[in-house]
Amino acid sequence: MFEYLKGIVTKIDPAYIVLDVNGVGYKILCPTPYSYDENQPATIYVEQVVRDTGITLYGFLSLEDKELFLKLLSVSGIGPKSAVAIMAAEDTDSLASAIQNGEVKYLTRFPGVGKKTASQIVLDLKGKLGDYVKKSTAAADLTPSLQDALLALVALGYTQKEVDRITPKLAKLPENTADGYVKEALALLLKK
């Protein structure tokens, strides 16, 4: 029902935050509540889960985290609380990478995840998390000068989408200075 909520974080608890949206305080369960600052504005990507016991809002820092939560929920044996506990115990990049690589033993270290559930997670989600793995490995493969060049392109006004489109081409070039990469990038961007 809700995509996101914008408001002021009024309370931070180990399991949840309270977000004041125009005078209404929403209790939102989060995998990483201490990522927010109290009495500061925040945008929380939320998922509303309706159960017999009540309605609960789960909140995430990014849309990608919310999507990963929904994918975890699609696995038989994983409920919302287990999905949040898994996401709280590990960063999403490492989690997605472990699932992609079929690391059942790695997944069993999460609370409430035994060997059977870990195998089910791998079975259901392997091959469906490519976007998360690409994002996590892509930055690690770039040289510092290329990373600087990509930041410079964004500072020059190019969108992240445009920069992401040419990044693989730049990464294949021989190592260069940041200025050299920017020149190559501008040539690629102007070709379109």
Curated annotation (Swiss-Prot):
GO BP, sorted A to Z: DNA recombination; DNA repair
Keyword annotations: Cytoplasm, DNA damage, DNA recombination, DNA repair, DNA-binding
GO cellular component terms attached to this protein's record: cytoplasm; Holliday junction helicase complex; Holliday junction resolvase complex
Region (Flexible linker): 137-140
Signal peptide: none
Region described as Domain III: spans on this chain: 141-192
Gene Ontology MF term list: ATP binding; four-way junction DNA binding; four-way junction helicase activity
Subcellular location as annotated: Cytoplasm
Gene3D superfamilies: 5' to 3' exonuclease, C-terminal subdomain, DNA helicase RuvA subunit, C-terminal domain, Nucleic acid-binding proteins
Region Domain I, residue ranges: 1-61
Segments for region (Domain II): 62-137
Domain-related comment: Has three domains with a flexible linker between the domains II and III and assumes an 'L' shape. Domain III is highly mobile and contacts RuvB.
HAMAP family: DNA_HJ_migration_RuvA
Main function: The RuvA-RuvB-RuvC complex processes Holliday junction (HJ) DNA during genetic recombination and DNA repair, while the RuvA-RuvB complex plays an important role in the rescue of blocked DNA replication forks via replication fork reversal (RFR). RuvA specifically binds to HJ cruciform DNA, conferring on it an open structure. The RuvB hexamer acts as an ATP-dependent pump, pulling dsDNA into and through the RuvAB complex. HJ branch migration allows RuvC to scan DNA until it finds its consensus sequence, where it cleaves and resolves the cruciform DNA.
Protein family: Belongs to the RuvA family.
Record note on quaternary structure: Homotetramer. Forms an RuvA(8)-RuvB(12)-Holliday junction (HJ) complex. HJ DNA is sandwiched between 2 RuvA tetramers; dsDNA enters through RuvA and exits via RuvB. An RuvB hexamer assembles on each DNA strand where it exits the tetramer. Each RuvB hexamer is contacted by two RuvA subunits (via domain III) on 2 adjacent RuvB subunits; this complex drives branch migration. In the full resolvosome a probable DNA-RuvA(4)-RuvB(12)-RuvC(2) complex forms which resolves the HJ.
The protein's name in its UniProt record: Holliday junction branch migration complex subunit RuvA
UniProt organism field: Lactobacillus johnsonii (strain CNCM I-12250 / La1 / NCC 533)
